[in-house]
Swiss-Prot record:
Role noted for this protein: Allows the formation of correctly charged Gln-tRNA(Gln) through the transamidation of misacylated Glu-tRNA(Gln) in the mitochondria. The reaction takes place in the presence of glutamine and ATP through an activated gamma-phospho-Glu-tRNA(Gln).
GO terms for biological process, alphabetical: glutaminyl-tRNAGln biosynthesis via transamidation; mitochondrial translation
Protein name: Glutamyl-tRNA(Gln) amidotransferase subunit B, mitochondrial
Family (UniProt): Belongs to the GatB/GatE family. GatB subfamily.
Gene (name only): PET112
Gene Ontology MF: a single term: ATP binding
Protein's cellular compartments: Mitochondrion
Predominant localisation class: mitochondrion
């Protein structure tokens, strides 16, 4: 009989993942975020590491390449971005920070050291709060502590060619400004980790300091975790959120198995760094082989000293933060669902090229205010958001027409007039959709005949006004004709019995089509129910 021994480093569980009460997860994150400044951190090279991928070493200054005699010149745009993020994370700003040298040798780090902020970082002692209704965590609120934020250089990029046994070095990324953010080990489940990463991504995008993309490397996450206060394990090589979550699951199960089998004192007492392969974690190094980085203050860079008015001015420039915007939109007078509010506020960065998040958000707020000023407390809260998110944006996508090109002719004030017409039932939803698409198509084709959009005139021109004076006899005859020509006894019986109540909307749709959208869906539904003698 073949006996296979267990190998803890290759442990995999086929059962659904769960955190066990006797094995407490303790987890923290280190997140490196590339800043989208115009220039690099300590040189005047263009900061464009992604668009220059096909042109290696094209954005490299003498300092980036560490040529002898070159000296760093601090890009203060990176400092401003770091202060913005620090304030958004409720950190204490260090008014007298410094840069330090972290010494190590690697091919893509030509200086022989990285300039960072080890001893006196730009900020510390902050927090980012997660909420049940916003972030879909299991607790009503969970505060994740921020130990510190520090400004530092990114490295170059190494590309290995195993077949030719050499390495190519691209220094376009060298000296790109980074913010390293280190959290406290406050995460106790995977939902919190996933939600925090998503929230942090949206925050840096909202502040316009980074794209926050994990896939491109603009944001890179390392995980520190331990179980039951055993030694900390650092996980690296985590290119996206699913990798982060799967690596934590695997490492948790691996360590639980070690503890259960009584090998914790042998295998979990020394801190170590492990890499995620996509399937499992593998050991890179242990504490005994940890590099001595020989930190020391950089003698070529002065301390960064901030006056109080600098911090105040930067604070005043920060836009309203996402959580505050969401809370505002789900409250009176907007009363949006959290789902709709998130569409307006949260920036996925997989953004449709037809609009920016800020454009969409501002457009909605102005449309709503104009609509509310006209109809007052009689407003339909869903009307503006539905017509903007679904109909307007849907049509823009279909026509490949940017919102910015539409705004000069279809301003929020003008669009609110359109919403008021729908509110007052001066045009049916079906006709309104056709009219909106027509107007947008004319704008796309640069039809100069549309100098100013007049929805009332267009409704008159295309005879889109609802047939409010249609007699009950005409309406009954139309509905009876539709039922007769449909000749579908099973469908009618399902409607009458209540087995398929929603099927009556199919009849309403036929009525709307036959009347070219001039009859109201409500009157059609009432008439169909009366003819069919529906009791429900």
């Amino acid at each position: 009989m073949l006996k296979v021994s267990k190998r803890y480093y290759g442990f995999q569980s086929k059962s659904p993942f769960q955190l066990l009460p006797d094995f407490r997860l303790k987890c923290g994150l280190e997140i490196h975020t590339q800043l989208n400044t115009k220039f690099k951190l300590f040189s005047f090279s263009t900061n464009d590491p992604f668009h220059s991928i096909d042109s290696p070493n094209s954005n490299v200054s003498f300092f980036d390449a560490a040529l002898p005699g070159t000296q760093p010149i601090l890009n203060y745009e990176a400092v401003i971005d770091a202060i913005k993020l620090s304030l958004a994370l409720n950190c204490d700003i260090n008014a007298n920070s410094q840069f330090d040298r972290k010494h190590y040798f690697y091919g893509d780090q030509p200086l022989g050291y990285q300039i960072t902020q080890h001893y006196s970082p730009i900020s510390s002692n902050g927090k980012l709060s997660l909420f049940e209704n916003i972030d879909n965590i299991d607790q009503s609120q969970k505060d994740i502590g921020i130990i510190q934020l520090q400004i530092e250089q990114d490295t170059g990029k190494s590309m290995y060619d195993d077949s030719k046994h050499f390495t190519r070095i691209d220094l376009n990324r060298s000296n790109v400004p980074l913010i390293e953010m280190v959290t406290k080990p406050d995460f106790t489940d995977l939902k919190q980790v996933r939600s925090f990463i998503k929230k942090y991504q949206n925050l840096v995008r909202h502040l316009k300091i980074s794209s926050g993309d994990l896939e491109t490397g603009a944001m890179r996450v390392d995980v520190n975790l331990s179980i039951n206060d055993y030694a900390r394990v650092e996980l690296k090589n985590l290119p996206n959120t699913s990798s982060i979550v799967n690596a934590i699951k695997y490492e948790y199960n691996r360590q639980v198995e070690i503890i259960k089998n009584g090998s914790a004192d042998e295998l979990l007492t020394s801190p170590e760094t492990r890499s995620w392969t996509g399937v499992k974690t593998v050991k890179l190094r242990s504490k005994e082989t940890t590099i001595d980085y020989r930190y020391l203050p950089d003698p070529e860079l002065p301390r960064v000293i901030l006056d109080n008015d600098v911090i105040t001015n930067i604070s005043n420039s920060i836009p309203t933060l996402p959580d505050e915007l969401l809370s505002r939109l789900i409250s009176k007078p907007y009363n949006l669902s959290m789902k709709d509010a998130k569409i307006l506020v949260l920036n996925s960065n997989g953004q449709n090229e037809m609009y920016t998040q800020e454009e969409l958000q501002n457009f909605y707020l102005k449309v709503f205010d104009c609509y509310y000023n006209v109809v007052g407390e009689k407003l339909n809260h869903k009307l503006p958001v539905n017509w903007i998110i679904h109909e307007l944006i849907g049509s823009l996508n279909k026509l490949e027409l940017p919102l910015s090109k539409v705004l000069p002719k279809l301003s929020p004030e003008k669009f609110s007039e359109f919403i008021v017409l729908i509110h007052n039932k001066e045009i049916s939803n079906t006709s309104a959709k056709l009219l909106l698409f027509h107007v947008l198509n004319q704008i796309k084709e640069n039809d100069h005949s549309i100098r100013e959009i007049n929805f009332d005139s267009l409704i008159e021109e295309f005879e889109l006004k609802p047939a409010t004076n249609a007699s009950k006899v005409d309406l009954t005859e139309l509905c009876q004709t539709i039922i007769t020509e449909l000749n579908n006894e099973k469908l009618l019986n399902d409607i009458i019995s209540g087995k398929k109540k929603n099927s009556i909307q199919y009849l309403v749709g036929l009525g709307m089509r036959a009347s070219q959208g001039t009859l109201s869906p409500q009157s059609l539904e009432e008439t169909f129910k009366k003819i069919l003698q529906v009791k429900w």
